[in-house]
Amino acid sequence: MQTVNTHKLISHLQQQGQFLTLSRCSGELVQNPISFTLYEHTQVSIISPGIISFSPKIKSDKAIVLSSGIHGNETAPIEICDQYVIDILTGKIRVAHRILFIFGNLPAMDRATRFVDENLNRLFSHAHASESVDQNSYECARAKEIEEAVAEFYGSGHGEESRYHYDLHTAIRPSKNEKFAVYPFLHGEKHDKEQISFLLACGIDTFLLSGSPTTTFSYYSSRQFGAHAFTVELGKVQAFGQNDMSRFTQVNDTLKRFISGQPLNLKSFNDQDVLIYQVNQVINKHAEDFELDFSDDLPNFSDFPKGTLLAHETGNEYRAEFDGEAVVFPNANVAIGQRAILTVIPTTLD
């Protein structure tokens, strides 16, 4: 039974749509699950602060997860998804498929930092229970909460649904290829070319094929639930309100069409339209004196001749193994034991 305060909250959301603002500023109001019907055609379920789902009353064939803010300072995807939620709650968008929105690291958003204590995107597939992390941290509790929300969301559908998860990010540094996606390791399954075409329609033409299991959010959804899942990098980190949203027109429009069931008119896959890379080296930091041997502002996907020194630390030097080997996500400031650089080389899809 809903209280007077709950009715006021629901009315406020339908008028203003400000679920994310409410989650960040008055999280206690959405701490407990709340469900209501939107305009007699969509079931709304507030799971917890920053986690909300929408389900059309008409049966659909897709279950979609859109996540943003897994790193709190990656603002453009947060702003995109926030606007979707506002538009759905206020009736400007009508969803055609079940969709779960996750705004990941709320305290880090307030601090304008990637995380508070732990990198949330290294805590999935139960890594939050590892002895190597602070299990009392906000991020460990949040990773567990997010895993449970995703499991419940996918599990509450019917067996004929196709599952999708787009984990939206922006990168610390600029990139030679501004928008790119990481395709999680598939354990021998085929990469889906229709998904590549879909992301190409979003303005993403560069794909990095992961070569091993990881503890990222997209790998969790892919491995545990068979979802078409990607970590999608949409550009460079900017402060809230400082993003040039015209740079996100393609991804914004395509995702909006996808969740509202409008035709996508995807181009057939052609390997000439995309750049495909595979991971060659995963370079982890083993000592406090780990140091990159290139500029801190070097763009992602910058490449090097074979033998070039990429990084060093006590007892180790790390060099390019191939001509044209490129670096992605270099970050010397990670914790010991975590990935400091990915190196990638060009490849093709089977």
UniProtKB/Swiss-Prot annotation:
Lipid biosynthesis listed as a keyword: no
Listed cofactors: Zn(2+)
GO MF annotation, one: succinylglutamate desuccinylase activity
Cofactor binding annotation: Binds 1 zinc ion per subunit.
SUPFAM superfamilies noted in UniProt: Zn-dependent exopeptidases
Substrates-to-products reaction catalysed: N-succinyl-L-glutamate + H2O = L-glutamate + succinate
Keywords per UniProt: Arginine metabolism, Hydrolase, Metal-binding, Zinc
Annotated pathway: Amino-acid degradation; L-arginine degradation via AST pathway; L-glutamate and succinate from L-arginine: step 5/5
Entry-linked Pfam families: AstE_AspA_cat (PF24827), AstE_AspA_hybrid (PF04952)
GO BP annotations, alphabetical order: arginine catabolic process to glutamate; arginine catabolic process to succinate
Domain of life: Bacteria
Binding residues for Zn(2+): 71, 74, 169
Record: active site: 233
Family: Belongs to the AspA/AstE family. Succinylglutamate desuccinylase subfamily.
Function: Transforms N(2)-succinylglutamate into succinate and glutamate.
Entry protein name: Succinylglutamate desuccinylase
Classification of source organism: Bacteria, Pseudomonadati, Pseudomonadota, Gammaproteobacteria, Alteromonadales
